Every structure is written in C-alpha cells, then in structure tokens.
Amino acid sequence: FALNLAFNGEGVASPQEAALALAHPGPERVLLAFVAGEPAGFLCGLLKRSACYSRPSAEVTELYVCPGCRRQGVARQLLEAFLDACRQEGVEAVTVLTGEDNAPAQALYQRMGFSPSGEAHFEQGL
C-alpha cells in the first residue's frame, strides 16, 4: 500500500481493497521487489485475452521503485520477471505507457528492447 500511495498519490486501493483483488486474481499480475528485506518496488501488469486475436497480449500498467533503491537494477528485474511470465503465457508483445517527460523510464524501456509504437493514446474521463 505504501509503495502504491507513494507512486500514485490519493485515490489508490486501500490495503483491504488490494488484498481482495490479490485474493481473487484475474488478468492482473503484481510483482514485488525487496532490497535488504524491505519493499523496494512493484510492477502491475495485465495479461489480456481477446476474442479478436489468437494470442494474448500484455501491458505494464505500473512500475515503481522507491527513490533510495533506484539505479540498482530493481526495475529491470521486475520487468524481466514480468516478460518471462508473459512468454510462458504465449504473449507475443508487451506494451507500456509512460509519461512523455519521464526520460529515465523511457531509457529503461528502450534498453530492454521496447520501441515507440507510433500509436496515439486517447483518454476520456467518466
């Protein structure tokens, strides 16, 4: 909960809501990383199956590493673990959305083989 709150701010799932979601897993995968026995970061990702495509797809929806644990390979390890899980599920491609101004994240994704998709991202608040 504390890592999610630090990353996303107000409006995050409460510890009870998160526990309920984790107790009834759906397409979401949540990975935690620890450094010296303390939570250091997390990755949330979705494995998506569609009636339109023969192979599942996946998306990294959240990736956060505590400031004091950055530049130690934590994000890379989380991402590698998620990519391995995706390969085991038959996923052919993984997408990730990050801020245009988040140069460190963009550099990480590019080092790990991701490339800009050229697709426009649209959102409508409800």
Regions found by a protein language model. Name each.
Residues 1-55, 61, 66, 79-80, ...:
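Acetyl-CoA-dependent GNAT
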Residues 5-6, 69, 92-93:
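Short, contiguous strand/loop micro-motifs
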Residues 16-20, 45, 70, 95, ...:
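A generic local structural motif
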Residues 49, 64, 97-102, 120:
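Short, flexible active-site-adjacent loop segments at beta-strand->alpha-helix junctions, enriched
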Residues 54, 72, 103:
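Loop/helix-junction capping segments adjacent to catalytic residues or to phosphate/diphosphate-binding pockets
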Residues 65, 71-84, 107-111:
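Conserved acetyl-CoA-binding loop-helix of GNAT-fold acetyltransferases
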Residues 76, 100-118, 123-124:
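Conserved active-site alpha-helix within GNAT-family acetyltransferase domains
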Residues 86-98:
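Conserved GNAT acetyl-CoA-binding A-motif
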